[in-house]
Curated annotation (Swiss-Prot):
GO biological-process terms attached to the record: proteolysis; symbiont-mediated suppression of host innate immune response; transport of virus in host, cell to cell; viral translational frameshifting
Modifications the protein undergoes after translation, according to the UniProt entry: Potyviral RNA is expressed as two polyproteins which undergo post-translational proteolytic processing. Genome polyprotein is processed by NIa-pro, P1 and HC-pro proteinases resulting in the production of at least ten individual proteins. P3N-PIPO is cleaved by P1 and HC-pro proteinases resulting in the production of three individual proteins. The P1 proteinase and the HC-pro cleave only their respective C-termini autocatalytically.
Keywords from the named record: Host cell junction, Host-virus interaction, Hydrolase, Inhibition of host innate immune response by virus, Protease, Serine protease, Suppressor of RNA silencing, Transport, Viral immunoevasion, Viral movement protein
Residue window of motif Involved in interaction with stylet and aphid transmission: 335-338
Family classification: Belongs to the potyviridae P3N-PIPO polyprotein family.
PROSITE patterns registered for this protein in UniProt: HC_PRO_CPD (PS51744), PV_P1_PRO (PS51871)
Its EC number(s): 3.4.21.-, 3.4.22.45
Domain notes: The N-terminus of helper component proteinase is involved in interaction with stylets. The central part is involved in interaction with virions and the C-terminus is involved in cell-to cell movement of the virus.
Cellular component aspect of the GO annotation: host cell plasmodesma
Protein name: P3N-PIPO polyprotein
Protease listed as a keyword: yes
Biological classification of the source: Viruses, Riboviria, Orthornavirae, Pisuviricota, Stelpaviricetes
Length: 975
């Protein structure tokens, strides 16, 4: 056995020593009987590592590279593809021949036709040309300069720009390019082209000469046999120009021709001319032709009726510059001789012309102000031209709306309005005749309006029109998805719970099982209105149903003075009855009843909102005299759920007690106005339809039960913001005094609250409820100094201040004012002085009450009381100044006794209870003392208790002799 080392790995080789060796060289090494791979062990140990490695590839640079290993699923997919391809190649299913005798089997009787090619005999397939990308070469040295010059010239040619070439000596040459066929000809600016006469017309610098040689064109490119005006400065190749003057240069710059022996010879602009040639040369500048036409036309057409002798005052060069600016401002073009520019200008309207020229005109005006201050007239011309160009009607949409509104109205004044509207649409391109015609039509419109205004001032209502709007009022609160359920019904949410304050106080329940007979007639102060609630029971017969759906007409007469409202002489249309197109009053018809709904709007635009329902399934109808509660119910729809509690409490506790039954429309509008201050969202709340009964002076707020009585006028007010106009004192209207509901007896509420206050003075539980829920009841204590002092002495006012200090500072401030007032009253002993102190403080407390905005019932009572006291004081002040005595002052003692009646009874009961408790305590304590003390001390203790008893009972005696009938606990015989 032989052991050899391969690297660091030992390998054992077994040798057979008995094997015979041959004579050749092939037997020189020992023959291994059993071959063993020396790397097997190494491969086995490195197998896992090699498995994680990729394939070993041979790179082009002679190195081995290990590739990224492939995932197993890719190796499996490649293996499947190789096997599939190998199977396909080894498959024997190969088509060797085609049997032409076989007839194909027809599976369908339908003729499938045959394939026809559109190729002709001249068809030749076009092979796709390979796209060869040109390699960009890096420009270096002189190539860069040539490339930049070439690109620069290309830009100048395409954009029709002026090329300026300057050498080191700052000698500049100018050139332009003009198109001749497919090539561009270079025109160098010569002296004679700018009105300068020189022997040498141009001197080129070195760079300009090289550019001119590069841009020179042959004479044949001009497509003409002779040169003509406009060819001055053109650079031509000398070898292609006939009859050119002696010149050694390869280029010729056209200046003009000189006759030499009756032969015209072309003169190069760089050649120096003699005096004779200067006088005879015919140059090819187009400016001569321009100035020839300009001068002749100017002289022939200049005005002759001038009031002065013209002189040459302005600089001629500046005149030319200003003329060029005016020309470009009036007619933007590249060349004044270009027909394409003329055509483009004619195809533009005024708006397009203004957009194209406005920026340049502004620049020209600024340039004239800075560099040409003497040419003020040119600036005025441009401003006038600019104003003329920008004349356009910016409100064409409104004109189209006018046309739509008057399309079906051929009579005056709408026919005149149509003509005026047509003229306004054409503003910017009007003739004088059209403007004059529009003025005549406007005169007719003014005459019509003047006659109509005069008729209104004469109370002539023949021209009065107050149509119902054809557009439905959009209530965003009824369109918001968050306010609707899946059936698009309004979701009341918390509003449904708080709406019970309305339903429980101002609505009657209707049990459908008992019928509707007792709810058919709604009582009025001086009549009745028949509701359609009984028609909820419908017959199935069509004829009977149609007969049942007829209303009972009531004659309310035509449009009259009581149907309209005026404010500062003009009609206030929302507060008027509605009319049709011809001025006839719109009258109500039969209104269908519905169940469980709140109806907003009227006629065909009514919206039905499902009312909040309960488990009983009963319906609700407003009580007689309280139909105006439906207005506040409609306003509740626009109140947010968070504020619905405050809204319903304010309506129940403050608004409805003021209104009561059958208030006037002015009071209802005032109440709505107050609510909109605290709840601004209700301004856009939609109202139920309001009908006007002129015979009875009543306004009916329709509910969901409809109306059989028909023929009423219809009020136009549709939303709360329109209804509150009835609350204005400036409104001249009989409608605002019509009854809708109301109770003018405000004093009853004050008396009830006052009795409740007197009852609670010495009852801590009631007084605590007043302080926490209705603190403004304490303000009513100002009616009596005794009541006010009782609250002050019992520390009730102090408790009210402490309770509201961290809840509502304004309420706490009012309670503080009451406490200060009570302390001032306690300092006075005379009743009249106490009343004067109280009355003097009423305006201050009333001003503070106006700053409180809380949904409390007692606010109204306190405000009414304070306003009465303040106004009464102002009235009495005038009487006192005149030397008279008010009867109210003499009756104050009687009023004080009247208020102290219940208050004094409570105090008497308290004294009796106190006496009984005191006597029991004294007797219990004395019985113990008498057992322990001697007779002398007993007598002394007896006298002290007797004196204390007299003081507590209010006696003025400081020492009283004990007797048996004195009432003293000890004035009795000792046992």
């Amino acid at each position: 056995m032989t052991t050899i080392n391969i690297g660091t790995i030992p390998v054992v080789i077994n040798q057979n020593a008995d094997t015979q060796m041959g004579e050749g060289t092939k037997n020189i090494f020992p023959i291994v009987k059993d071959f063993v791979d020396p790397f097997a062990d190494l491969e086995m140990r490195c197998a896992e590592r090699v498995k994680r490695m990729g394939e070993l590839c041979f790179s082009k640079k002679g190195r081995y590279i290990t590739m990224i290993p492939k995932p197993d699923y890719i190796k499996a997919r490649e293996k499947e593809q190789r096997e599939e391809e190998l199977n396909f190649q080894n498959s024997e299913h190969v088509l060797n021949s085609l049997d032409t005798t076989c007839t194909p089997e027809h599976h369908s009787s339908r003729n499938n036709g045959m394939q026809v090619s559109f190729k002709t005999q001249h068809y030749k397939r076009t092979f796709r040309k390979p796209r060869i990308q040109a390699k960009k070469r890096d420009l270096k040295g002189q190539h860069t300069i040539h490339y930049v010059a070439k690109e620069l010239l290309s830009i100048v040619k395409k954009r029709d720009m002026v090329l300026e070439v300057v050498d080191k000596r700052k000698h500049a040459n100018f050139a332009t390019f003009r198109r001749y066929g497919k090539t561009y000809g270079m025109h160098i600016t010569l002296n004679h082209m700018v009105r300068k006469r020189r022997r040498v017309d141009v001197t080129l610098n070195k760079l300009m000469t090289e550019i001119a040689m590069h841009c020179a064109i042959p004479f044949e490119c001009l497509n003409t046999l002779t040169l003509r005006k406009g060819h001055s400065g053109l650079v031509l190749q000398t070898e292609t120009v006939p009859n050119v003057h002696k010149i050694k240069s390869k280029i010729t710059i056209v200046r003009g021709v000189v006759n030499e022996g009756n032969i015209p010879v072309l003169i190069d602009a760089r050649k120096k001319l003699s005096g004779r040639d200067m006088s005879t040369i015919r140059e090819f500048s187009a400016g001569d032709l321009f100035w020839k036409g300009y001068n002749q036309t100017f002289i022939d057409n200049r005005p002759t009726d001038l009031n002065h002798q013209c002189t040459s005052d302005l600089n001629v060069t500046q005149c030319g510059s200003v003329m060029a600016l005016l020309t470009l401002a009036l007619f933007p073009c590249g060349r004044i001789t270009c027909k394409k520019c003329v055509e483009n200008f004619l195809n533009q309207n005024n708006k397009e012309r203004f957009n194209n020229a406005s920026v340049f005109i502004n620049q020209v005006i600024q340039l004239l102000e800075k560099g040409f201050s003497e040419f003020k007239h040119s600036k005025e011309i441009l401003l006038m031209f600019k104003e003329r160009l920008q004349m356009e009607n910016p409100a064409t949409d409104q004109c189209m709306e006018i046309a739509k509104a008057t399309a079906a109205l051929p009579e005056a004044p709408f026919s005149h309005i149509k003509e005026i509207n047509n003229v306004l649409l054409k503003y910017g391109s009007l003739s004088n005749e059209e403007v004059g015609g529009a003025s005549k039509h406007l005169l007719e419109v003014v005459r019509y309006i003047r006659n109509r205004t005069d008729s209104i001032q004469r109370n002539d209502l023949s021209k009065f029109r107050n149509k119902i709007s054809s557009k439905t009022h959009i209530n965003l609160d009824l369109m918001c998805d968050n306010q609707l359920d899946k059936n698009a019904n309004f979701v009341w949410g918390q509003r449904a719970y708080h709406a019970k304050r309305f339903l429980s106080n101002y609505f009657n329940e209707i049990n459908p099982s008992e019928g509707y007979d007792k709810f058919i007639f709604r009582k009025l102060p001086n009549g009745a209105r028949e509701l359609a609630i009984g028609r909820l029971i419908m017959p199935t017969n069509f004829e009977a149903f149609r007969e049942q759906m007829k209303g009972k007409m009531i004659d309310n007469g035509p449009i009259g003075k009581d149907c309209v409202s005026r404010m500062r002489g003009s009609f206030c249309y929302p507060c008027c009855c509605t009319t049709d197109d011809v001025g006839t009053a719109v009258i109500s018809d039969f209104k269908m009843p519905t169940k469980y709904h709140l109806v907003l709007g009227g006629n065909d635009l009514a919206k039905y909102i499902k009312l909040p329902t309960d488990t009983t399934g009963n319906m609700y109808i407003a009580k007689d005299g309280f139909c105006h509660i439906n207005i506040f119910f409609a306003m509740l729809v626009n109140v947010s759920e968070e504020k619905s509690k405050d809204f319903t409490k304010m309506v129940r506790d403050q608004i409805m007690p003021k209104l009561g039954e059958w208030p006037t429309m002015m009071d209802v509008a005032t109440a709505c106005w107050q609510l909109t201050v605290w709840f601004p969202d209700t301004l856009s709340a939609e109202l139920p339809r309001i009908l006007v009964d002129h015979k009875l002076g009543i306004m009916h707020v329709l509910d969901s039960y409809g109306s059989i009585s028909a023929g009423y006028h219809v009020l136009k007010a549709n939303i709360v913001s329109q209804l509150i106009k009835f609350a204005s004192d400036d409104l001249e209207s009989e409608l605002k005094y019509y009854r809708v509901g109301g109770d003018c007896n405000f004093g009853s509420r004050v008396r009830i609250d006052t009795k409740f206050l007197l009852k609670s003075i010495y009852r801590p539980d009631l007084l605590e409820r007043i302080i926490e829920h209705e603190p403004f009841v304490l303000v009513l204590a100002m009616q009596s100094p005794a009541v006010l002092l009782a609250l002050f002495n019992s520390a009730s006012l102090e408790k009210a201040v402490q309770y509201w200090m961290h809840r509502e500072m304004q309420v706490s401030h009012i309670m503080t004012l009451l406490a200060v007032l009570a302390s001032n009253v306690s300092a006075s002993k005379l009743l009249t002085t106490q009343f004067e102190i109280i009355e003097a403080s009423a305006p201050q407390i009333l001003a503070e009450m106006d700053k409180v905005h809380l949904p409390m019932h007692s606010i109204h009572s306190a405000n009414v009381f304070l306003m009465n006291m303040s106004e009464s004081r102002e009235t009495d002040k005038t009487i006192d100044e005149l030397g008279f005595y008010s009867f109210k002052k003499s009756s104050r003692i009687l009023m004080e006794k009247n208020l102290n009646g219940g208050f004094g009874g409570a105090m008497a009961r308290i004294r009796i209870v106190g006496t009984v408790v005191f006597n029991k305590a004294v007797v219990a304590s004395a019985s113990k003392i008498f057992k322990l003390c001697n007779p002398t001390r007993r007598a002394r203790y007896k006298r002290q208790v007797h004196n204390l008893t007299q003081v507590i009972r209010g006696s003025d005696k400081t020492t009283v002799t004990c007797s048996e009938g004195s009432g003293c606990p000890f004035c009795r015989k000792e046992d």
